[in-house]
Amino acid sequence: MIEVFDKIRDLDEFIQISLLSEFYYCKRRCSLILLEGNNSDNVYTMEGTIQHSKVHSSQTEKRLDSAKIFNLELFSNNYSLIGKADCIECVKDKRGAYIDILDGYYNLYPVEYKHGKLRDEEEYKIQLCAQAICLEEMYNITIEKGYLYFINDNKRLEVRLSDELRQKVLFGIVEILKIISESKMYPPKYKKSCPKCSLYEKCAPKNENINGYIKNMWEEIL
């Protein structure tokens, strides 16, 4: 972990937290977004964007012993991360972090909103963990858990922010920075979810796989 941390500190680039989710979902998609500026919308991404926008209807909601902060800017100088949190749930605790906009001490729990129904996706957990890492640096605290909230069925999943998950965040950061610094384009790898991707036509995973197969055949013949 220390070796990975040192690699990150030696680099000047900052990356968006959401790119970690892209990277672990599909490395090809992540490299297309970074290197060719491709980030098109389709019916699936547009629906998710509309639902996401409803999350940010207000900046704060404060109750007696708890509060919610929406659309909070996040950063980590140590890990070269920037981004926004959909929602931070704040629970009053004298041992927690002082939050100036709430004028009190709170424990913080990041909540990432996702389109669709409840499902256990690793890339979502990694994105959530990266948000927690930023909050820990910003407020000098330790966060042990966060939540994934699924909009369509109004359910949420508790995520324990384990050492294993944190290691995956660090590995993802280093690999994304390599894509940027080395112009590293990942090859396509077709899977069932590919046709729903907004970059499906640009990526052309089936065509690339066929071309690669033909090339290998010719190399064997020659």
Model-identified regions with their sequence ranges:
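Structural motif
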Residues: 10-20, 123, 185-192
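Metal-dependent nuclease catalytic cores that hydrolyze phosphodiester bonds in DNA/RNA
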Residues: 1-110, 210, 219-222
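Metal-dependent nuclease catalytic regions and adjoining charged, substrate-binding loops involved
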Residues: 136-222
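Generic detector of isolated residues embedded in canonical secondary-structure elements
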Residues: 25, 86, 130, 193-196, ...
